[in-house]
Amino acid sequence: MKTPEDCTGLADIREAIDRIDLDIVQALGRRMDYVKAASRFKASEAAIPAPERVAAMLPERARWAEENGLDAPFVEGLFAQIIHWYIAEQIKYWRQTRGAA
């Protein structure tokens, strides 16, 4: 993949963006593997949401955004959506693997 400075046209730019988007989707898949693995360590469904963990994660993601020149509120909101979706998926997975309804 070319650096942004080495791109000679929109085709190069779009190819790089598509590659980055694929990397993001693959990272989300790897994240799901860990989310499912975490369910092994949750004694009950009620332990899954872990609001204290979410409360600690979001400001850290906002800080990472700032350190990378991105809009912190946008990134924090994006991660809030990501995290809450994964929590819902982990609950479904926990129920499936524990035989719960």
From Swiss-Prot:
Changing K42H: At pH 5, 15-fold reduction of the affinity for isochorismate, but only a slight reduction of the catalytic efficiency for lyase activity. Inhibited by endo-oxabicyclic diacid resembling to the conformation of the transition state. SUPFAM superfamilies: Chorismate mutase II. Changing K42Q: Loss of mutase activity. 15-fold reduction of the affinity for isochorismate and 3-fold reduction of the catalytic efficiency for isochorismate-pyruvate lyase activity. Substrate binds at R14, R31, K42, Q90. Keywords: Isomerase, Lyase. Involved in the incorporation of salicylate into the siderophore pyochelin. Catalyzes the elimination of the enolpyruvyl side chain from isochorismate to yield salicylate and pyruvate via a rare pericyclic hydrogen transfer mechanism from C2 to C5. PchB also catalyzes the nonphysiological Claisen rearrangement of chorismate to prephenate in which the pyruvylenol tail is transferred from a C3 ether linkage to a C1-C9 linkage. This is Isochorismate pyruvate lyase. It comes from Pseudomonas aeruginosa (strain ATCC 15692 / DSM 22644 / CIP 104116 / JCM 14847 / LMG 12228 / 1C / PRS 101 / PAO1). The lineage of its organism: Bacteria, Pseudomonadati, Pseudomonadota, Gammaproteobacteria, Pseudomonadales.
